[in-house]
Amino acid sequence: MSDHFRAFSFVDRILSDKQGESIVGQYRIPDSVKEFPVALVAESIGQCAAMSSMAALNFKHRPVAGIASVVEFCGHALPGDVLKLEATLTRADKEAVAYSGVAWVDDKPVAKLLNCLGPMVLMEDFDNPETVRQRYQLLDDSGAPPDAFGGVESVNFESVEKGDGEREGQFTVPHQAAFFGDHFPRRPVFPGTLLMDLKLKFIADLIVNLEGGPWAVVGMHDVKLRSFMPPGEVLELFGKVDKVEGEKASILVQSRRGKRRNSSARVMLAKKSL
């Protein structure tokens, strides 16, 4: 069975779509998965916005991950939950899509994306335009069959503590993974939101050992992805405590390919209530 629209697709119904302007969709998290990280909730919002922008451009272009000014982690999504996805687009043209969005579970926000910008690429370079059009029509009509997603393969990294609130590590993009069949069929690329989730795990020890805690991750600011990550690519990971100010703190985390930075973000922390 093909992994397309199964291994990394997180919109299974479009409830309404004013193409290129606003969209409301939903996604039911399968009961069978062990977890559904908040990074994948953010992915769901982005995919919902992408559907509206692709339809507005007659499926000749599609967006890829670029910049998110603010990602807020407001809650948790569990297996069996139904995500309601909302996105408002302020731009959808051949150059880029700009949008903000939110995911809800039972009228409670789980994640918010603010001021996101995704560059557009030619659809035919990454996927079959007609196949994506048919997928959109299915979502807009009866919706896709639920429970197609079976979880994401574990992705490992090597990490060493550098001292003084710093950490270094290395990560190799898998050579093979089911999600490459969905992201994307014609040009496999490691998803930016999986890198986001990896970064949060990478700096987990920095958060635990940070003075003034215990701390909770409440979001990420200035999230930037500068280049594609093909199968087998080796990335260096770097994390460093940025600021500790009262009940708030932040950690800078980035990845590099050689001497060139390929992604960066500021992880925002808030002191946990005891």
Please annotate each region the language model reported.
Residues 33, 37-51, 185-188:
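Compact, glycine-rich, soluble single-domain proteins
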Residues 99-100:
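Short beta-alpha junctions and helix-cap segments that line functional grooves
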Residues 45, 195-200:
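Acidic helix/loop or adjacent segment enriched in Glu/Asp that either coordinates divalent metal
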Residues 1-36, 60, 77, 90-96, ...:
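Non-catalytic linker/capping segments at the edges of enzyme domains
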Residues 181-183, 195, 209:
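Long, positively charged binding patches that form subdomain-scale interaction surfaces
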Residues 85, 103-104:
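Soluble ligand-binding/transfer domains with enclosed cavities or grooves
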Residues 49-86, 111-112, 117-118, 200-238, ...:
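Hydrophobic beta-strand-centered segment that forms part of the acyl-chain substrate-binding groove
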